[in-house]
UniProtKB/Swiss-Prot annotation:
One of its GO terms (biological process) is translation. The keyword Ribonucleoprotein applies. GO terms for molecular function: structural constituent of ribosome. This is Large ribosomal subunit protein bL28. One of its GO terms (cellular component) is ribonucleoprotein complex. The keyword Zinc does not apply.
Length: 78
């Protein structure tokens, strides 16, 4: 699976990390992807979206649990 945002398409980029002594090391910057269950057109989908899209897009809301789903009770400790 690609390391890419499902909404904006943000992916990994590569470049050089430059230290204080101007030493260049190759490195990779990766987006902050989160696996989220989102409601799109009335149906819930699993998507990997970046944190910026999740924070900034008011239409992207996490899917709520079903109203008629039974709640799981904690098992008693013995």
């Amino acid at each position: 699976m690609a390391r890419r945002c499902g909404l904006c398409g943000k992916g990994t980029i590569s470049g050089c990390a430059v230290s204080k002594s101007m030493h260049h090391c190759k490195r990779v910057w990766k987006p902050n992807l989160l696996a989220v269950r989102v409601v799109v057109d009335g149906s819930a989908l699993n998507m990997r979206i970046c944190a910026r899209c999740l924070r900034s897009n008011p239409l992207m809301k996490k899917a709520q649990p079903r109203a008629n789903a039974p709640l799981r009770a904690a098992a008693p400790k013995l």
